[in-house]
Each structure stands twice: as C-alpha cells, then as structure tokens.
Regions:
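Signature of the first transmembrane helix
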Residues: 3-59, 210-237, 361-362, 366, ...
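Membrane-water interface segments that mark the loop-to-transmembrane alpha-helix transition
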Residues: 6-19, 44, 49, 53-102, ...
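Helix-loop junctions and terminal segments of transmembrane helices
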Residues: 56-71, 248-273, 340-343
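Hydrophobic alpha-helical transmembrane segments
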Residues: 111, 115-121, 143-192, 356, ...
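Membrane-interface junctions at transmembrane-helix termini in multi-pass inner-membrane proteins
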Residues: 121-144, 327-353
Length: 403
C-alpha cells in the first residue's frame, strides 16, 4: 500500500501543477475572446483532442502494459522508437486536418485562434506520458509532460495580455513540447541512428493495432464532439456557457487520468499482494472520485465558471449537473477498461460497447443541437457514458472474481 500511496502522490501531486496552471490562462482567453470567440477556442481544443487520440493510436492503452511487464532498457527503448515512428507519421496527416476543420467551424473573427488551439490538444498525442506510467516514474512524467505545459502557459499569459492574440499560445506550447520531446528521446533511447532506420514495420503496426486504437478513437470522438456539434447549430451566445461547463469538466478528467495512471502499473505488476485487492482498491477509488467530481460540477459548476470565465460565459446549473453525470460514469468505467479488460485481451468487447455508446450519443447530440437544445447535448453525452459503463460492468466483475 505504501508503494501505491507514493505513486498516487507522484502521479497526482506533480501533474496537479500542470492541471491548475491553465487556470491562469482561461480567465484571460475567455475575456479576450468574448462570447463568440470563447466557444470557438473550446471547439478548436475539442477537435484537436480527437486528433491527439489518432496520433496516440494504441500507445496510451497498450504502451503502459508493454513497458510495465518488461523492464529491459533495450526492450523499452525499442518500444519507444516504434511509438515515435508511428506517431510522427500520423502527426503529419492529423495536424493539417484538425487545423483546417477548426478553421472552418470557427467564428469568422477567430479562425486563427480556433485553428491554433486545435494544435495545442492534438500535440498531446506525442506525449511520453504512457511510457512514464508504465515505468512507474512520476518524476519523468512531471518533467517531460507537465513542466513543458506549465512553462508555455506562464510565458503565454503576459504575451496574450500584451497582444490580445490568442493564437500565440499555440506556437509557444508547440515549441515547448517539441524541445521536451527531443530531450526525452535522448534519455530513453541512448543509441543514436536507430529510431528511423527501420520504417517498414510502421504501417504494419498501425494495421495490427487498429482494434485498441479504435477503442480510444471512438471514445474520444463522442467525448470531443459536444462543443463542435453545438458550435455548428446552436447560437454562440448559448454555446458560451455550455463551453465553460465543458472546459471545467475536461480539466476534471485530468484527475481521472492521474488516478488511472497511479493504479494501472500497480495492479499489473507481479507482486505478492492479492491482485483482487489491488483491483478492488482501484475500482473503489475511481467510484469515489466520480461521485466527488459529479457533486462538485452539479453544485459549484456554475459558480466556478462565472469566477474563472466571467459572468458572460457562466454555465447553467442543468448543464453542469449533466456533465457531472458524465464524469461519474467515465471515472467508474476507467479501472475496468484499463486494469481488467484490456490486459486480458477484451479489446473487441470494449470496442463494440464503445461504438454502440458513441453512435447513440452522437446521434442524440446532433438531434438536440439541430433543435437548439444545448442541455440536450450534455444529456446525450451522459447517456452514452452510462451505456458504456453498464455494458462493461458485468464482464469486468467476472474478471475481478477470477483475479
């Protein structure tokens, strides 16, 4: 238990700084952008999040398992080399796509802002976080994933205040992340000249791991679509508050990710402690986090958005409550997916339920958006997350009993 507490401190305490730092930027961006520009910025980030999932492919789900189960430095270096080859190929395709899509959906006066913000989230697909998680090294995660974002945000605050150009944040962040990735590569891959020497297996890897990647992509698709769908059909004045609720919700999801990072390596590593007890601890912890997050969003969400984004961008009570339900279900389903089903090769089951929930969720979102019902979009997302959780609950519990 001491080991997991140390990991919890590392994987939550250190990245917590990077989670909170953007709150320095949000009040500035939301006020500089105004109603129309704020929803454009959030829409661009959501589009980029989908692009980031494409770039990451299957590495965020299978990568930590591969690293955790084989401690050989040579093996880990080769795994990271393969990941870099595949992700750079995908980046060359994804970056232009998300930039153009965000540009097209943006408010006319904020096209460059929306397009640039799409790149700030798409670049997350190149993050080495999955490697650090599998290796159980939160200090690496903080140094090469959290710190570059913190530094970029601190630099961007005075730049945006002085220039009122939101798009400059995208350039600053991309530069910061790029430098950190080069340094990280030199640390984990000490042998020079081999990273790009073997390119033949890149497309083969992408084909072989399409299943796990599809799970991540389909899940990210419906998670990232609420604001872009609303942006296409709902007036900007209405979408301003909705976008604020979406932003607070997505910052909250970092806590789910951090807790999942803490438990994934711990539950999968060979240990004397009972696997069932470790899995149960992860499930209970995620459920408690989900309930706490849902309560916060439902009760304090409107106040938080008013303080952070300004009264003109304040989210409604119902919108926040529905986002709270989504938070609960996504937190509760995380340990079943990451710690039980995926390591046991149940990718097809996860993919089927993810696609079912995504299709239903997106269809209901579009239906609500075309009728101008913003809260209906949030309701559709909550329903889709509930469907996914319920569909995976019993298979996950059966695996837990066998652990």
């Amino acid at each position: 238990m001491r080991a997991v507490l140390l990991r919890l401190a590392g994987f939550t305490g250190l990245p917590l700084v990077s989670i909170l730092t953007p709150f320095l930027l949000i009040p500035i961006v939301s006020r500089v952008a105004g109603e129309g520009g704020w929803s454009t910025v959030v829409s661009g980030q959501a589009i980029g999040a989908f692009g980031g999932a494409v770039i990451a492919w299957s590495w965020n789900t299978l990568g930590p398992v591969e690293i955790a189960q084989n401690p050989s430095p040579q093996h880990r270096a080769e795994v990271y080399r393969q990941s870099l080859r595949t992700r750079l190929v995908l980046s060359a395709l994804v970056f232009p796509f998300v930039f153009i899509l965000a540009w097209q959906l943006a408010a006319p006066d904020h096209r460059l802002d929306g397009a640039a913000m799409s790149l700030t989230t798409a670049v997350a697909g190149l993050s080495p976080a999955w490697y650090c998680i599998g290796a159980g090294k939160p200090a690496l995660l903080a140094t090469f994933d959290a710190l570059p974002r913190v530094a970029a945000t601190i630099v961007a605050v005075p730049v945006i205040l002085l220039t009122t150009h939101i798009w400059l944040y995208g350039i600053i962040l991309l530069a910061s992340v790029g430098v950190s990735l080069v340094i990280f590569h030199r640390i984990v891959v000490p042998e020079r000249g081999k990273t790009f020497a073997s390119r033949g297996g890149t497309w083969q890897y992408l084909r072989q791991h399409f299943g796990p990647a599809a799970i991540s992509l389909s899940g990210t698709t419906y998670a990232a679509t609420p604001v872009p769908i609303g942006q296409a059909f709902v007036p900007n004045a209405v979408m301003a508050g909705f976008s604020s609720a979406d932003t607070v919700y997505r910052f909250g999801l970092f806590s789910v990710m951090a807790l999942g990072n803490t438990f994934q390596g711990w539950t999968l590593e060979p240990q004397d402690a009972s696997p069932k007890k470790r899995h149960t601890a992860a499930i209970v912890s995620h459920l408690a986090l989900g309930l706490a997050g849902a309560a916060f969003l439902a009760i304090l969400g409107p106040l938080a958005t008013e303080i952070i984004m300004g009264s003109v961008n304040k989210a409604g009570q119902l919108t926040c409550a529905l986002y709270g339900l989504s938070f609960l279900f996504i937190s509760a389903s995380t340990p079943f997916i990451r710690n039980l089903l995926l390591p046991q090769g149940r990718q097809r089951l996860i993919l089927v339920w993810t696609l079912i929930s995504a299709v239903i969720g997106i269809a209901l979102m579009v239906l609500a958006a075309t009728r101008g019902w913003a809260d209906g979009i949030a309701l559709a997302m909550a329903l889709s997350e509930a469907i996914l959780f319920l569909g995976l609950l019993m298979p996950g519990l059966r695996l837990l009993r066998k652990a």
